[in-house]
């Protein structure tokens, strides 16, 4: 186990706590680093963007279809289904109970004010398979709306962390069209006071400037708690043998260092 001594360390960003680097090249290196950091178990929280911009931001990357379009035959996955499958499957071995709280946001019932649970009474999904099954069931019935803010799902994740007093990884899958950047930025700063990592997966055509701002330049955080990954860019790279592993490495790149920061800040 461990990180190869030949790994190139590339400084990525400076925060109040220190520099977090993109340093891992393979999924095995990331998983080894997670274990070396002491992360024996974690808990996942999933947030899905149901804002109306999903209907047009797949013009280039998803052949003009809505990013939430579901193939009734089951032969192909949309970007949301792919991202859920890859990311959650990678992290599920670290999730002891395999129970995943899953929420949607940005639909006509929640707009930018709240979230809705995938199951009534906030019942959690039992593993990745049930997350995907429930996503397939509810998505055709969701009335997409807006405006777009990540603040409600981040604040919901903070509530869960406060209740459980355990480390969680919030995975937000979204098309990147944030229309409430100040509220989202404030929520990211607030989240840095808790044992919570935020991984945002951008699906569709972008633009991604706001996501890159959240990833790189937010001041006032206790540690660098936000990682952004451009799904289409990763999945379009050439000369890649295993696209799922490539995507998982990009999405989980900063989790080992984030968890180490959380421990050093005595949040657990």
Task: Name the predicted role of every residue range.
Residues 1-268:
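Acidic, low-complexity intrinsically disordered regions
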């Amino acid at each position: 186990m461990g990180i190869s001594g030949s790994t190139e360390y590339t400084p990525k960003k400076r925060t109040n706590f220190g520099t977090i680097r993109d340093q891992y090249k393979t999924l095995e290196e990331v998983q080894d680093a997670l274990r070396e950091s002491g992360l024996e178990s974690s808990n996942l929280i999933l947030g899905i963007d149901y804002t109306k911009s999903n209907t047009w931001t797949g013009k280039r990357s998803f052949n003009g279809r809505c990013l939430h379009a579901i193939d009734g035959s089951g032969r192909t996955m949309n970007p949301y289904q792919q991202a859920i499958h890859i990311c959650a499957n990678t992290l599920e071995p670290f999730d002891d109970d395999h129970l995943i709280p899953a929420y949607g946001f940005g639909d006509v019932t929640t707009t930018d004010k709240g979230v809705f649970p995938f199951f009534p009474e906030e019942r959690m999904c039992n593993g990745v398979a049930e997350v995907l099954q429930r996503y397939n069931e509810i998505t055709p019935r969701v009335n997409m709306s807006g405006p777009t803010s990540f603040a409600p799902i981040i604040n919901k994740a903070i509530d869960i962390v406060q209740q459980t007093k355990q480390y969680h990884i919030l995975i937000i899958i979204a098309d990147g069209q944030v229309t409430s950047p100040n509220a989202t930025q404030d929520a990211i700063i607030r989240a840095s006071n808790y044992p919570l990592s935020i991984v945002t997966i951008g699906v569709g055509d972008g633009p991604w400037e706001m996501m890159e701002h959240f990833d790189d330049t937010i001041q006032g955080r206790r540690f660098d708690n936000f990682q952004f990954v451009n799904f289409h860019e990763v999945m379009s790279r050439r000369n890649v043998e295993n696209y799922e592993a490539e995507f998982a490495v990009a999405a989980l790149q900063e989790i080992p260092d984030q968890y180490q920061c959380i421990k050093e800040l005595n949040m657990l």
